[in-house]
Every structure is written in structure tokens, then in C-alpha cells.
Regions:
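Short, flexible helix-loop junctions that flank or precede catalytic/ligand sites
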Residues: 1-230
Length: 230
């Protein structure tokens, strides 16, 4: 996994979104990040999942995993009670609705490191999706909250690996001051070019990552053309 993933996992607070279509390996990426935190930090981690896919054992961290419908009625209820238990890290699973997104933003703003997933295919579309969930009168406030609490968006697709298996191709956006500004000012369309030139901040576009994977002989040109298109 890219070095930037460690930096994301080492963060004290903020919102980290892992996005992509169903079956793109989002929960595998999140499980790897939780595992890294568990091995390197003394923290309290609370996960809210539907269903629980990876079972984590306490290593350095205390981990509570809750399953929606079995342990709790909904993501919102679970998230509300989670905030009362004051975990350091909260994994929300899917951020489907306004209430869950609002709670996740509030949690990220109040000093928790929050991980969530969406089905969007890029960082820009992820920002738009979150803002779109809210009515017009709330959009500016949500933009402002998001610009302050967002830490990173990791969008991914799975590609067929040469020689068998699959490999994830990532777009990575980190919330630099320039990115935060674009979110606040509703100029998300300009985000792609900042990601493209943001390698120093650990950023990369899906296309840049696909080219690296091709150069390393991991994936074929045909596979990249059909899944990503260069």
C-alpha cells in the first residue's frame, strides 16, 4: 500500500473516505488501515459495519466491532452511541444518508478520526455526493464543515493482476489548503488538476497510478484501457 496510507492512519482526527463501486476492495483497504493503527497506536477503535467482514483482535488498540441490525438498529443510532463512548477512531462503513454524514462530520470535527465509505468513483464526485445530500440552505455550512474536517479521499478500482489475482488502483486526494479552498468555494471541478500535480503531498490520479502499475508489469495495457481508460 502507498506510504501515504500510513500517514492517513497516523492522523489524530478528521474524515477519511474510501470510495469505489461495490466489490472494489474498500473494506479490505479499511481493514488494512485499522490493522495498521491496531499494531502501532494505543487507541480505542469502534467500528459500525453492515455486515462485519473482517474480525480484528485487540493488539495495541481496544477494538469494538458492532454489526448493524444485530447489535444496533442503524448507522445513525450506532454512531450516536459511539460518540458517547468517546473512541479515538470510528469506522462508519457506508455513509448513505444525511444523518449519518452529519454525524460523521461532527465526529471528525470534534477530534475523532473517522473512516467512511461511499460508492463514488473519484474524490471530486465524492465531495459532490456529500453536498448533494443536503438541502440548498445547508449546503454552504456543509461545504465549510467538510473543508475543515476532510483529511483524505481514496477512490479505488480493482484491476486484474498479470499472473492472476487482483490489484487495487487508487486515486488519492489529501486535503491541502488548496483543496480545502476548492471545497469551501464550490470549485470541485478544479480538484483533478491539483491531485495531478500533488505528488509531494502523496496525491495521485487513478490514471497516474495505472501507469505506474503498467510500468511495474503488474497489469496489462488492455486491462487499464477497459477499466480506467488512458
Amino acid at each position: 500500500a502507498p506510504e501515504i496510507f500510513k500517514k492517513i492512519a497516523n492522523a489524530e482526527k478528521g474524515l477519511v473516505l474510501v470510495t469505489g463501486p461495490t466489490g472494489s476492495g474498500k473494506s479490505t483497504t479499511l481493514a488494512a488501515i485499522v490493522d495498521y493503527i491496531n499494531r502501532n497506536h494505543n487507541k480505542h477503535i469502534l467500528t459500525i459495519e453492515d455486515p462485519i467482514e473482517f474480525v480484528h483482535n485487540n493488539n495495541k488498540c481496544l477494538i469494538n466491532q458492532r454489526e448493524v441490525h444485530r447489535d444496533t438498529h442503524s448507522f445513525q443510532n450506532a454512531l450516536r452511541s459511539a460518540l458517547r463512548e468517546d473512541p479515538d477512531v470510528i469506522l462508519v462503513g457506508e455513509m448513505r444518508d444525511k444523518e449519518t454524514i452529519s454525524l460523521a462530520l461532527t465526529a471528525a470535527e470534534t477530534g475523532h478520526l473517522v473512516f467512511g465509505t461511499l460508492h463514488t468513483s473519484s474524490a471530486a464526485k465524492t465531495i459532490d455526493r456529500i453536498i448533494d445530500v443536503f438541502p440548498g440552505s445547508d449546503k454552504d455550512m456543509v461545504r465549510s464543515m467538510l473543508s475543515e474536517s476532510l483529511r483524505s479521499v481514496i477512490a479505488q478500482k480493482l484491476l486484474k493482476r498479470n499472473g492472476g489475482g487482483r490489484i487495487a488502483c487508487h486515486e488519492i486526494m489529501t486535503a491541502t489548503p488548496a483543496i480545502r479552498n476548492l471545497i469551501r468555494e464550490d470549485k470541485v471541478a478544479q480538484m483533478y488538476s491539483i491531485i495531478q500535480t500533488g505528488a509531494a503531498h502523496g496525491m495521485q490520479t487513478m490514471e497516474q497510478n495505472a501507469r505506474q502499475l503498467m510500468a511495474q508489469g503488474m497489469v496489462s495495457r488492455e486491462e487499464v484501457d477497459s477499466k480506467i481508460g488512458l
